[in-house]
Amino acid sequence: MLFHNPVFLFIFLPIVLLLYYYASKYSKFAHEYFLVIAGFFFYAWWNIYLSPLIIISIIVNFYFGNLIKNNLEKNSKKIILMISIFLNILFLAIFKYADFVIENINYLFNVNLDLLNLPFPLAISFFTFQTIAYLVDCYNGIIEKKTRLSQFSLFVIFFPQLIAGPIVKYNHMMAQFDEKNNRLINQQNFYLGLVIILIGLFKKVILADNLTL
């Protein structure tokens, strides 16, 4: 579901916006849960069969983040950080370079190993490096407060930035969700967001798409 897709613009986004404001009034953390669900739906729209990958990444990195924050011994924290970064890079490399490695093995050793032909999961580079940045901040003591799974999930799968980024700091992003005024309907912010969307659509549909022809 691309941002200039009519399904996104006229169905998904308006429904999410309305339900977000409703959820914000319902309970303290309902807006977080709702945006996480919306993010998973947005991701699964691309390929529902590969969507468990981002769920696995979220759960594993959430666990590593807690291990790093709860471990008082610096050397142990460093080892946990190194292991977590290695696993994240390996996770990314398997999907990105597995067939490249197999092709070179076939060429160098004159064998005929079958290619894996793995599909490249949507936004895997983005959410991998986003979670690595989170783990590094946990190690450096920048993220000290206890993180709820819903918060970390939202940090990773927030749909407006999931496809194109940018990679942001956890504390900076979550501070915006924690701000009560951001959970209220604000006419000025609404029109500002609408203008930004229209500018983005103009750049994409009118300029970028036509320049590539």
Stretch-by-stretch model annotation:
Residues M1-L213:
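Membrane-embedded transmembrane alpha-helical bundles that form the catalytic cores
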